[in-house]
């Protein structure tokens, strides 16, 4: 039976190290002797139910670890269920009971170190490259036991679409990128050409061939297939490592790139520069014959460089980009491959690229910035030295990425421990039930205090293209090391809120100097236009997006400002200013003023804001209204507030909820979910947005209707049902935040109960009529 381990690290292992004793680390271990007959049966039943219902609900309910935690804590919900018939007759007692049930359940999900574990996955291109890397390096069976491989295959089967392919993410239509990767992954893990339940492999291969064959895979797929030896490097556009030795004044210097783009193409360029190809096994030779329409030896690789399936081509290359690739391919690459330039330039460039890879690995404790980079950097280290310590350190951090649920084993983005915990604690504080959960709040506060990054990247970090990180919070845990503005702002705000609760309940306050450092981080990430970026200051120019090589994502070349990050920063800085009015007062006031102007300036014509990190306009409108309200804007004195309220009120469904399709993200316009289907997480965001804008004082009936939906949807144990996933990134991809379904309904009910006047007595029969 699989068990989730918390803050687990072997102190005797010389290649595994941590900055704070592995706080927040979550890893899975298989114990063949664990579990009673009843527990094992419950797990199998959860797996069966998911598989049977997989085309209706695509995301897991994250049940395996929840079963474990609830049993370990002997959780039992004692509050009886209640249903609301008339939304206008919700009493304080009904709202409080529903809230208390949700608070009790959410509290029971807290880990011993104070964080809230949860799945953070969903893209279907995360896991196969890790399998490919382990296969190429010969470590697949060492790292992935038979039990691992069984669960990986389960995940692949569970998320195969009815047409035989796999989408970019678990809710998406089939793409060449993920269908090819997952087909090869199944074959590497032992399935035959026609293996898998329901003819999974044959149906996948048919999809690939019916859509033109694997020459139509996008560029990231071309890279991984070239590494495996089932594609030729000459079929990829150039990724010259000489990029890393360009003069810093050039606009295309890597220091000006978005950190994720920079750190993906860093190891890619190393592997491309080496033209590395793994061992050509009999399986690789078979795959060459299985995924193409023409014989492998007759493929026109030069033509293949520009091929991309229409199902994948979200961001097609502009003509100028293809001209650049052709020039590099025809003239530059042959030049750099010849003596003496291969010695003077290429070897030097490869050395510089590897220097950066090692630097990033060390400063993230070999977690790296994310899962895409993890497999690439690990492989690059092995190519440099198969027996080196860098590769050994990488192997020990693979488990940080793996997650088990009823739909199998998947690879996480890199964990959302701090992000989820900051929101969970804010929801619990908003409940006004703090006296009932002091231990939960104390553990959570300790987790946040001990997870703040306490140092900048090592050495001369500016020459390694890095920004300050001291005083920040990351998305996952402190060892990850990468500052993020919204993660910093939400954890910062949470620490400030907890500091306002008596220390005998939540523990001692943070050192003010640590709070000042968080202010420094937030101010450093604000651009001239008032917007706040996500990871680093915006250094590159917008026109560089014309060079986006990915085909499947948008706005990934340079750093951008975001409404959500800007709003989070406003709310945190305003609360800080209230508690510490004498620290950098003028700078903070100026920052807030500019940030408010930015939020107002990017509002859509319909009153919404585009969401970059959630689905989509509903998510970002909650942030937009929250930021403006924190800055003193009201429905009466601010047009943007009125427009935002109008957007939310006009998109509310007849059942009282809100439901927005994920297609809003790639299409960049509001698209409602089909019919009357509402999403409880999105309903919670909309409720809180309206509450920020004073809807309770004007007309609380939309809030009552939304609260009725939340209360009536709550399960008997205090949980809420899993619905469509609501996280997003890079315009075209979704991310499953499994904790959202508990955090946001609880938070919305807390704010509803706190801000909306509710009767204390149950309405009499006469009043109902």
UniProtKB/Swiss-Prot annotation:
Q: Top enzyme class of this protein?
A: isomerase
Identify the GO cellular component terms for this protein. lipid droplet
Catalytic function, reaction form: (S)-2,3-epoxysqualene = camelliol C
NCBIfam families for the chain: squalene_cyclas
Q: Which Gene3D superfamilies match?
A: 1.50.10.20
Signal peptide span per the entry?
Answer: none
What's an example of a GO molecular-function annotation for this chain?
Answer: beta-amyrin synthase activity
Record-stated family: Belongs to the terpene cyclase/mutase family.
Q: Which UniProt keywords apply?
A: Isomerase, Repeat
**Catalytic residues (positions):** 486 (proton donor)
User: What are the cysteine partners in each disulfide bond?
Assistant: none
- Supply the source organism for this entry: Arabidopsis thaliana (Mouse-ear cress)
Please, one GO biological process term?
A: triterpenoid biosynthetic process
Q: Give the EC number(s) under which this enzyme is classified.
A: 5.4.99.38
What this chain does, per the record? Converts oxidosqualene to camelliol C. Minor production of achilleol and beta-amyrin.
Which parts of the chain are PFTB repeats?
149-190, 641-682
| Protein name per its UniProtKB record | Camelliol C synthase
Q: Which Pfam families match?
A: SQHop_cyclase_C, SQHop_cyclase_N
Q: Provide the organism lineage as a comma list.
A: Eukaryota, Viridiplantae, Streptophyta, Embryophyta, Tracheophyta
């Amino acid at each position: 039976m699989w068990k989730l381990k918390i803050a687990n690290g072997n102190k005797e292992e010389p290649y595994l190290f941590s900055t704070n004793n592995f706080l927040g680390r979550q890893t899975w271990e298989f114990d063949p002797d664990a579990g009673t007959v009843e527990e094992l049966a419950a797990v199998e039943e959860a797996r069966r139910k998911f598989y049977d219902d997989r085309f209706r609900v695509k995301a897991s309910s994250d049940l395996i670890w929840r079963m474990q935690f609830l049993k370990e804590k002997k959780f039992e919900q004692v509050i009886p269920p209640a249903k609301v018939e008339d939304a206008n007759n919700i009493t304080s007692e009904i709202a409080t009971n529903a809230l208390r049930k949700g608070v009790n359940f959410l509290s029971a999900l807290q880990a011993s170190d104070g964080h809230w574990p949860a799945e953070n996955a969903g893209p279907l291109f995360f896991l196969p490259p890790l399998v490919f890397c382990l296969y190429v390096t010969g470590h697949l069976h060492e790292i992935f036991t038979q039990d691992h491989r069984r669960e990986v295959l389960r995940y692949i089967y569970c998320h195969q679409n009815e047409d035989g392919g796999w989408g970019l993410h678990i809710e998406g239509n089939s793409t060449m990128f993920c269908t090819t990767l997952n087909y090869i992954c199944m074959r590497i893990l032992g399935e035959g050409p026609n293996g898998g339940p329901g003819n999974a492999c044959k149906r996948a291969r048919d999809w690939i061939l019916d859509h033109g064959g694997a020459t139509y895979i996008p560029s990231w797929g071309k890279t991984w297939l070239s590494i495996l030896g089932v594609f030729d490097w000459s079929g990829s556009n150039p990724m010259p490592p000489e990029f890393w030795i360009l003069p810093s004044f050039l606009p295309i210097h890597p220091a000006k790139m978005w950190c994720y783009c920079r750190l993906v193409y860093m190891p890619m360029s190393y592997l491309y520069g080496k033209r590395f190809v793994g061992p050509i096994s009999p399986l690789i030779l078979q795959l060459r014959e299985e995924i193409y329409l023409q014989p492998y030896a007759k493929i026109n690789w030069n033509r293949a460089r520009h091929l991309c399936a229409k199902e994948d081509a979200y961001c097609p290359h502009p003509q100028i980009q293809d001209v650049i690739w052709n020039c590099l391919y025809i003239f530059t690459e042959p030049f750099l491959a010849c003596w003496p330039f291969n010695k003077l330039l290429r070897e030097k460039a490869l050395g510089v690229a590897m220097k950066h890879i090692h630097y990033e690995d060390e400063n993230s404790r070999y977690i790296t910035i994310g899962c895409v980079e993890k497999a690439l950097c690990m492989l690059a280290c092995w190519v440099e030295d198969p027996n080196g310590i860098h590769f050994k350190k990488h192997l020990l951090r693979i488990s940080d990425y793996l997650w088990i649920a009823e739909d199998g084993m998947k690879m996480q983005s890199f964990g959302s421990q701090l992000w989820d915990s900051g929101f969970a604690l804010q929801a619990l504080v908003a409940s006004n039930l703090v006296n009932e959960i002091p231990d939960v709040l104390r553990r959570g506060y300790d987790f946040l205090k001990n997870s703040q990054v306490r140092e900048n990247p090592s050495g001369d970090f500016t020459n390694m293209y890095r920004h300050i990180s001291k005083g920040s919070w990351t998305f996952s845990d402190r060892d990850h090391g990468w500052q993020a503005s919204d993660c910093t702002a939400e954890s910062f705000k949470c620490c400030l809120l907890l500091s306002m609760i008596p220390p005998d309940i939540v523990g001692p306050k943070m050192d003010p100097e640590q709070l000042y450092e968080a202010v420094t981080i937030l101010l450093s990430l604000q651009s001239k236009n008032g917007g706040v970026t996500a990871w680093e200051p915006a250094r590159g120019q917008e026109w560089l997006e014309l060079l986006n090589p990915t085909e499947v994502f948008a706005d990934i070349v340079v750093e951008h400002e975001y409404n959500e990050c800007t709003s989070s920063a406003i709310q945190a800085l305003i609360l800080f200013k209230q508690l510490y009015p004498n620290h950098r007062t003028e700078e903070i006031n100026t920052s807030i003023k500019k940030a408010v102007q930015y939020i107002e300036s990017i509002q859509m014509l319909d009153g919404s804001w585009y969401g970059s990190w959630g689905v989509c306009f509903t998510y970002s409108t909650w942030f937009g209204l929250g930021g403006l309200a924190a800055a003193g804007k009201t429905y009466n004195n601010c047009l943007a507030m009125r427009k935002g309220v109008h957007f939310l009120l006009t998109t509310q469904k007849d059942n009282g909820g809100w439901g927005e399709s994920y297609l809003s993200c790639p299409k960049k316009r509001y698209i409602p979910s089909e019919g009357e289907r509402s999403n409880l997480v999105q309903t919670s965001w909309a409720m809180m947005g309206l509450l920020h804008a004073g809807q309770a004082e004007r007309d609380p009936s939309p809030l009552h209707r939304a609260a009725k939906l939340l209360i009536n949807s709550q399960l008997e144990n205090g949980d809420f049902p899993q619905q469509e996933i609501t996280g997003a990134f890079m315009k075209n991809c979704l991310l499953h935040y499994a904790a959202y379904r508990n955090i946001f309904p609880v938070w919305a009910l807390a704010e509803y109960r706190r801000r909306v006047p509710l009767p204390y007595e149950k309405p009499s029969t006469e009043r109902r009529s």
